[in-house]
Amino acid sequence: MVTRLRLVSRSSRYATVKFTDSVSACSCRRLFSASTDPEPESQPEQAPPTNPVTGDEKLRNLRVLLQQNRIETARGVLSSLLRSDSTPFASPKELFSAFSLSSPSLKHDFSYLLLSVLLNESKMISEAADLFFALRNEGIYPSSDSLTLLLDHLVKTKQFRVTINVFLNILESDFRPSKFMYGKAIQAAVKLSDVGKGLELFNRMKHDRIYPSVFIYNVLIDGLCKGKRMNDAEQLFDEMLARRLLPSLITYNTLIDGYCKAGNPEKSFKVRERMKADHIEPSLITFNTLLKGLFKAGMVEDAENVLKEMKDLGFVPDAFTFSILFDGYSSNEKAEAALGVYETAVDSGVKMNAYTCSILLNALCKEGKIEKAEEILGREMAKGLVPNEVIYNTMIDGYCRKGDLVGARMKIEAMEKQGMKPDHLAYNCLIRRFCELGEMENAEKEVNKMKLKGVSPSVETYNILIGGYGRKYEFDKCFDILKEMEDNGTMPNVVSYGTLINCLCKGSKLLEAQIVKRDMEDRGVSPKVRIYNMLIDGCCSKGKIEDAFRFSKEMLKKGIELNLVTYNTLIDGLSMTGKLSEAEDLLLEISRKGLKPDVFTYNSLISGYGFAGNVQRCIALYEEMKRSGIKPTLKTYHLLISLCTKEGIELTERLFGEMSLKPDLLVYNGVLHCYAVHGDMEKAFNLQKQMIEKSIGLDKTTYNSLILGQLKVGKLCEVRSLIDEMNAREMEPEADTYNIIVKGHCEVKDYMSAYVWYREMQEKGFLLDVCIGNELVSGLKEEWRSKEAEIVISEMNGRMLGDVTVDEDLSATEKL
């Protein structure tokens, strides 16, 4: 029969100990109530000598104290023994074993006392767990309070694996764990990211009719939210309500955070509304979580509404709130708004810490506002802020982004003057910028500088260099860097190989890219989906669709799921090669895999069908996009408007009117070209006027369309004024413009005017299109302008553009 004993009393700070030696029940009761029944001596009891010579003497002293029922003295001696550096026992477990051998009749009493001291006075939690397992092997079982305390301390000291093992050991006995014990075990499982184990224990406790607490539900909901299992988290929330448990503020905050991180801020709002209905007052954490999620989703206006509600309810933003606002406005490219928040914080007397300040500085640096960043940093330093490495690195990166490498170096010097040693992150900013500029020699000089300063290049440093040389297609240097990394003991990672593979694919070196992939696999670095996507994209861009699908099959064979980027790349490759039926099959497969097509998916299909001349299918795909809630991009409208020109003005105008985006030059030119092709020059010139009013810069394509339209409606004399306007805008006409003009005159059979324009074109060194040249020569000969025709033929042949063919009848006439 397992011995059980209450070790830690709820009403006393002392352990309750059951003695098996000849100690009276009266004495025991006195000992267990030491706080209310003091020992009879008026003077504090003196412990035996504290420096016995041997371990045996220490054990004998403890045995005597226990036999004399002097529990508190024994506790003090035991606590000192455990803390002593000169203790003869390697561990508490060894101490227990030694005591058990010397005093077997007291081993139960001693075990309880030892466990109590380990948990309470000494806080030796790992040793307490080891002792627990040793006691179990001896058939000794601690009390419920002892186990509760042990599990609680194990969780607090983050010994989650041990917590689970102790609890499973408890389950294996005939001991009935308490609700608190289950809670600690479930908490440990969730902390280990093993929500499955937590749910298993959760179901076990319900089976044993131990009803979970709000704490346990909160722990599991938190674990499910962190794993983005929001449906399961919702089910647990509903179960709480069904059991008439009132969700706490923590419950609601956890769900709000989960939905935000899962990219579903709309659901977060619903949880917030549920809080209001249940009269649960929000906390600052509630609002901070909502703000972070909304900014992440790009819902800036909604975030600002939440901020207003927060202030209306009397909440004062803290440093973390300001960090969220700075980061949120930054990620949504609203640095000016971030500056406004900063001024509000200053006016409110909020003191910026280094973390919050670094986020604001990063926002400004990303948008190239390095001068403003310096101004704010100066203001904060005047208030006592001491810049740390993060702030300096942020500023160095800001200078590098703007191309001010002198300013970046000055910041490095400022770091050194402040006693900080710039690390690889600081130097990487400079190295990256030189690589972006293609100045690899300067990049290498920076690497040498950091080495001289005692800073070893990091994997990221080498990866930056690989990318720099790769973009210049200097692949031999890339391989040299890989070798240098290995020689220095810096193992290339997935990014190292991925950077090189990507550059090789962009440089049409597909064979070499595959060799690098095999090399990384041989070195134990497994390619991820991103690397496979690079290879697939490289194959598709070269029209090697079969090779692309070979890689996709290899992915599946290795258990790597195809993601949306993979499918989009394959669909784009199929669409470019006219294999539209196969592309549509992949579109269906995307949905079957639980993925959602995006705008890139549809743009590829629209482009493919457009190239095939199937405008109706393009429009159908566009309508399907809208029904699915996918917002078209400017590229979508570029494709559709250029394709719909032949379909007429009405369809083009409908597409133009449906745009929720600000039209760019390509869109305006597409619509204007449609008007010109269909001869509606009034609308064409009105649109040109609108472009000028909206500061949309006109280009040669704009004027080419206007010239084409004027020629279409027979206003040949107006063409010269458009050419003059182009010249006034320093937009000198080139070959394409002159070809349009010559062809336009030929189409209305004004061949001599066409010839005049040809002469101007020729004098400026531009070449006439061969087909247009044939048309011009034929027309000139029809009008008996053989001399001009011969000049055109001679000049075009002289330009090595091939012979200009004319009808045999015209040739015969020429001979006459």
From Swiss-Prot:
Residues 1-39 form a transit peptide. It holds the Pfam family PPR_2. One of its GO terms (molecular function) is zinc ion binding. The keyword Flavoprotein does not apply. Residues 34-57 are annotated as: Disordered. PPR repeats lie at residues 108-142, 143-177, 178-212, 213-247, 248-282, 283-317, 318-352, 353-387, 388-422, 423-457, 458-492, 493-527, 528-562, 563-597, 598-632, 633-662, 664-698, 699-733, 734-768, 769-803. Its main location: mitochondrion. It is found in: Mitochondrion. InterPro entries: Pentatricopeptide_rpt, PPR/CCM1_RNA-binding, TPR-like_helical_dom_sf. Keywords: Mitochondrion, Repeat, Transit peptide. The keyword Transmembrane helix does not apply. GO terms for cellular component: mitochondrion. Belongs to the PPR family. P subfamily. This is Pentatricopeptide repeat-containing protein At5g12100, mitochondrial. The lineage of its organism: Eukaryota, Viridiplantae, Streptophyta, Embryophyta, Tracheophyta.
